[in-house]
From Swiss-Prot:
Monomer. Gene3D superfamilies: Rhodanese-like domain (3.40.250.10). This is tRNA 2-selenouridine synthase. Involved in the post-transcriptional modification of the uridine at the wobble position (U34) of tRNA(Lys), tRNA(Glu) and tRNA(Gln). Catalyzes the conversion of 2-thiouridine (S2U-RNA) to 2-selenouridine (Se2U-RNA). Acts in a two-step process involving geranylation of 2-thiouridine (S2U) to S-geranyl-2-thiouridine (geS2U) and subsequent selenation of the latter derivative to 2-selenouridine (Se2U) in the tRNA chain. It catalyses: 5-methylaminomethyl-2-thiouridine(34) in tRNA + selenophosphate + (2E)-geranyl diphosphate + H2O + H(+) = 5-methylaminomethyl-2-selenouridine(34) in tRNA + (2E)-thiogeraniol + phosphate + diphosphate; 5-methylaminomethyl-2-thiouridine(34) in tRNA + (2E)-geranyl diphosphate = 5-methylaminomethyl-S-(2E)-geranyl-thiouridine(34) in tRNA + diphosphate; 5-methylaminomethyl-S-(2E)-geranyl-thiouridine(34) in tRNA + selenophosphate + H(+) = 5-methylaminomethyl-2-(Se-phospho)selenouridine(34) in tRNA + (2E)-thiogeraniol; 5-methylaminomethyl-2-(Se-phospho)selenouridine(34) in tRNA + H2O = 5-methylaminomethyl-2-selenouridine(34) in tRNA + phosphate. Pfam families: Rhodanese. Keywords: Selenium, Transferase. Its EC number is 2.9.1.3. Belongs to the SelU family. InterPro entries: Rhodanese-like_dom, Rhodanese-like_dom_sf, SelU. Residues 11-134 form the Rhodanese domain. One of its GO terms (molecular function) is tRNA 2-selenouridine synthase activity. GO terms for biological process: tRNA wobble uridine modification.
């Protein structure tokens, strides 16, 4: 039986995974849709690992059973049973498909539940994800470029073969790019990207991928090197919308929607504080590139804009610091980067013209 094919099918189907690894392992990397219900917590796993090194496998196994027994064992068993009842098509998963998933499988069988496990565990799924990404990005790639506020992400999302890298990374790429959802670990981001590629590829006869023109990193996540190499050679279509239209997109995204999201998440007072800190942090992150004097001036303008927004709800004041930020920093930076790829540009136009051009391809 072809295990790689089975792994692909499991990932494409969003098969629920009951991941019994320790929390620290899960945080370092997990598959999309996995839930972490550990057999051993971090300290328990560390103790068993130390015992294994000093006294061998049998002693470590014995210690593990002593640590996870009685009420602790029963509580964890109830959690696994509840997870299986919620996800009857789920699979058990540990690091390598070894003792931990087999132990949990056996304990569940003793209660009348027969839950399958992932042969090879997370490591096998991880290797499948890495290999799938490498294989799939060999297909042609078309990049959508343009200055900040050009609506590139929206264009990508509209394409049936579009891959929203920023959505997968939970970050919009700029110093103001973070969202309310924390970014995933690097391995989890790569896994999520691989699954997205597999899903899109399975839905259609794919001629090429459509991606946003990104740098090496999106927030804390960096793009897999195999993808970066392919993107560096890819043709680019550039969105060139009027400056005023870009400002309105940025107003909606950063001053209206982010304000709403923070208030929704943390309430009026806490949300406003978080929103204010978010904007200040974005400006602070590029203070050295702006120069400390310019940074201080724009920070003062930001403070006045926030006071205005708080008092009357208007976001107009933010234009007084956003416009110079675009003119003096973001636009020159992107245009400089784009000049280095000038030979790859295949089309330029407004957002609608690019959308029409993409449909015609």
């Amino acid at each position: 039986m072809n295990h790689e094919t089975n792994y692909h099918a499991l990932l494409i189907a969003d098969t629920p995974l009951i991941d019994v690894r320790a929390p620290i392992e899960f945080q370092q990397g997990a598959m999309p849709g996995a839930i972490n219900l550990p057999l051993m917590m971090d300290d328990e796993r560390a103790a068993v690992g130390t015992c294994y090194k000093r006294q061998g496998a049998d002693a470590a196994l014995s210690l593990g059973h002593r640590l996870v027994c009685g009420d602790i064992r029963q509580q964890r068993l109830e959690a696994w049973k509840a997870a299986y009842q919620r996800f009857p098509n789920g699979y058990l998963c540990c690091a390598r498909g070894g003792q931990r998933s087999h132990i949990v499988q056996r304990w569940l069988q003793e209660t009348g539940i027969d839950c399958p496990l992932i042969e090879g565990g997370y490591k096998a799924l991880r290797q499948t994800a890495i290999q799938a990404t490498w294989q799939l990005v060999q297909k042609p790639i078309l990049l959508i470029g343009g200055c900040t506020g050009s609506g590139k992400t929206q264009l990508v999302r509209q394409q049936p073969n579009g891959v929203d890298l920023e959505g997968l990374a939970r970050h919009r790429g700029s110093s103001f790019g973070r969202t309310l959802k924390p970014q995933l670990s690097q391995a989890s981001f790569e896994n999520k990207l691989a699954v997205e590629l597999l899903k899109i590829n399975a839905r259609q006869t794919l001629k090429r991928w459509v991606l946003e023109d990104e740098g090496r990193t999106i927030g804390a996540n960096h793009l897999p090197e195999c993808l970066r190499e392919r993107m560096a050679q890819a043709p680019i279509t550039v969105v060139e919308d009027p400056f005023a239209l870009r400002l309105e997109r940025l107003r909606e995204e950063y001053f209206i929607r982010m304000h709403h999201d923070f208030i929704h998440a943390y309430g009026d007072e806490g949300g406003w504080q978080a929103y204010s800190e978010y904007l200040h942090h974005g400006l602070f992150a590029i203070r050295r590139r702006l120069g400390l004097q310019r940074f201080a001036e724009l920070t003062n303008t930001l403070d006045m804009a926030l006071a205005d927004q708080l008092s009357n709800g208007s976001t107009d004041g933010h234009m007084a610091w956003l416009v110079p930020l675009l003119n003096e920093y973001y636009d020159p930076m992107y245009r400089y980067q784009l000049e280095k790829k000038a030979a790859n540009i295949v089309f330029r136009g407004t957002w609608q013209e690019v959308a029409n051009w993409l449909k015609a391809q």
